[in-house]
Amino acid sequence: MDENVYPLAIDGVQIVVIEVPRADYSMRPVYIGENPFKGSYKRNHEGDYHCTQAEVRAMIRDENEGGNDGLILEEYTMDDIDLETLHRYRNRFRFVNEDNAWNDLADKDFLEMLGGYRYDRQKKDEGLTMAGLLMFGKGLPIRDKFDMINMDYREESDVSFDVRWNDRVTYDGTWENNLFNFIQKVMPKLTADLPRPFRMEGILREDDTPLHKACREAMINMIIHADFQGEGTLKVIKRLDRLEFTNPGILKLPKELIYKGGNSKARNPRMQTMLRMIGYGDTAGSGFPTILAAWAEKKWPEPELEEDTILNQVTLTLKMISDDADKSQKTSQSANGTLDGTLSHSEDQIAKLKELIIWNPKVTRKQMASTLGISERSVQRLLNTAEEIHFTGGGRNGHWEITKKE
């Protein structure tokens, strides 16, 4: 186009600048000859390099307008679903969508409605989709099928030469390594230090601050835009001055369109639906502007979205500038109760208890104490204070319930 070719004067010398715009994802790979695996090249800074077969396959996958997470995985069935994970999701779904007819469906039918199980009438085939297995599957089948993908959360707020992280969530044999569990484990840790507004009736959404929404959007964006058929790590790093979210797969859209908002080309639209149905993620294309607005409100540096075309990954960095006055306010708030509309320390902990119960109605007091970093006796005092939290039943059938305030 004409705007991509123009003269430019440098040190009194006129040169002609020819800008080669990035090809649309639906047109990639652009190649020479008849074989894309032999004729595809990409520019890495100072030169053009032959694309690897993995890179070409990734570009071909990205041509699919319907995303790739609806792919039926042969030989994978409902036996590969971790029912405990699925039922935790259904508990949250039921809480958010009380009158939804899907609540009465059997697990397999419910999963089909979400896009996690699919029938292919033409091929007369059926089975779990990529979205279904990755979101709710057992750890071993997931690692067998997606052996080049990892999940990793690290808190590096107080590291030293011999301490590389303060907290970590990764494959360690203590949990079923699916995406829903990863979100469940990481989100409370990610937002643990953020203040909450003084509104207790809206457990899931109304008590969100712009920062809570931004962190959630960053986490969800990392998942719905990840290329799970490639190689890499879903990585979240929490530091004192920043949060970093990394996913495998390069950007499908130019950065300027992403920053502008209103455009969404998720690689995993079925996962996007699954998360949106429980209150995670808003209108398509609005996620990144939500993050930008939250950071602008705090007058923090603009979020940085960086693409590494060598490692084939994208990293979103959210920098947070420390403010001594803000720290002083938090200290005063903890000692004296609510201040400027934020929750007191105990009310904040009760809100976190409610989140834990919604995730897992059978959560134990010991698990509550471990997550909140307090003693079991302190947990019991909080439970005694929270009149809307009740324990029903006994033995294996016992579980927590939350009574909505009138």
Task: Describe the role of every protein-language-model region.
Residues 1-36:
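Divalent-cation
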Residues 23, 39-230, 238, 243, ...:
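Active-site helix-to-loop segments that bind/position phosphate- or nucleotide-bearing substrates
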Residues 143-144, 254-341:
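Flexible, glycine-/charge-rich segments associated with ATP-binding catalytic modules
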Residues 369:
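The alpha-helix within a helix-turn-helix
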Residues 377:
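Key DNA-contact positions within bacterial/archaeal DNA-binding proteins
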Residues 383:
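DNA major-groove recognition helix of helix-turn-helix
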Residues 396-403:
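Minor-groove-contacting beta-hairpin "wing" of winged helix-turn-helix DNA-binding domains
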